[in-house]
A protein has these predicted regions:
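A short, well-structured beta->alpha microelement
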Residues: 12, 17, 35, 40-62
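Class I SAM-dependent methyltransferase Rossmann-like catalytic core
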Residues: 1-26
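A short SAM/SAH-binding and catalytic strip from SAM-dependent methyltransferases
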Residues: 64-80
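Beta-strand-connecting loops/turns
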Residues: 26, 62, 93-94
Length: 148
């Protein structure tokens, strides 16, 4: 007899988020959102050892390479407030991946505008039956390459 295994919501979203982030197991990752602790433990279980949640990450100093944001059952307006301070934790070459509930195209446009308003350039996205994710990188990368 084959037993069906229920996959927790955190596991369903972690694979597409990691695929968009393209992060190694050594990169520093900050996790935000209502289920950030659950995602942090799942990342630890998968071998990502340098992961923190927004509740235990210290002061913002551009120390994280990737921010994974679980924004299910929350508004884009509330995301804008979180992005106000979250981007300060990212390195100049940092990347943000935001997971949201399934929404209408207008909601996706609002998400894109919110990311762009915080100095992020949308790079890629994925749509699944239980939500979608968008990755965006900091625009500071271009200024670094000009200096070099």
């Amino acid at each position: 007899m084959v037993q069906a295994r229920l996959i927790p919501a955190g596991e369903r979203i972690i694979e597409p988020m990691l695929a968009l982030a393209r992060c190694s197991k050594l990169q520093r990752i900050i996790v935000a959102g209502s289920r950030s602790a659950e995602l942090m433990f799942e990342l630890h279980r998968r071998g990502h050892v340098r992961v923190a949640t927004t509740s235990n990450c210290g002061l913002p100093a551009g120390q994280y390479d990737v921010a994974l944001v679980d924004w299910r059952q929350r508004s884009i307006k509330a995301l804008e407030t979180t992005l106000d301070w979250l981007v300060d934790f990212l390195s100049p070459a940092g990347l943000v991946v935001v997971w949201v509930d399934p929404q209408e195209p207008a909601g996706n446009r609002r998400l894109r505008r919110a990311l762009e308003a915080h100095g992020l350039t949308v790079e890629a996205g994925t749509i699944r039956e239980h939500g979608s994710a968008v990755s965006a990188y900091r625009n500071d990368v271009t200024s670094i390459s000009k200096v070099a």
